[in-house]
């Protein structure tokens, strides 16, 4: 008998069970998916059904919204916005994982929630850094954010990086990280995790469509000297990258 490999990034966390359990659509718990027997997929060390029962047969509270103070704001070449803001310590810890992201908006705007990957989450200073490519109406609205002002965020959310399990398992080995454009932002937590696991990390960057590499300071802090390369040619991996 074969089972589909199904997982849930929230399983076993403080956000589990979620609204899917209330509607009988839990991804992992068989009893919260219409069955009358236990046949859990990807056991996470906690019984989701028991948590649901002890919580009054309802979902746990979802992600919270926070108003945070903007510590620094830098606009690079009118195309990339770097924002650093102060956040609660536990939230910073939660967002230090590879693939973490949040939803952000200006304090006055209740409609335009923008999902943004975490560039850096400093658990010593409680400063979170995010980098945003300015393109459409939602991201242009974020240009109104000023240093010393407030930013409204909702999170934490995880697994914005595919294959995050493999990143965590990679130890005492060699790794190559390729990134292009705004992909350089979520790249940083991945590099951090790889280096924490004693991997030798080679970083190859393609700054296109930007004019420059805007994460140089963060790479220097990790003692990484990136190689520059054209990674994409007419929608395909370039001959140079191959």
Model-predicted regions and their roles:
Residues 1-62:
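Cysteine-cluster motifs in flexible loop/terminal segments that predominantly coordinate metals
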Residues 13, 54-57, 69, 102, ...:
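Generic preference for well-ordered secondary structure
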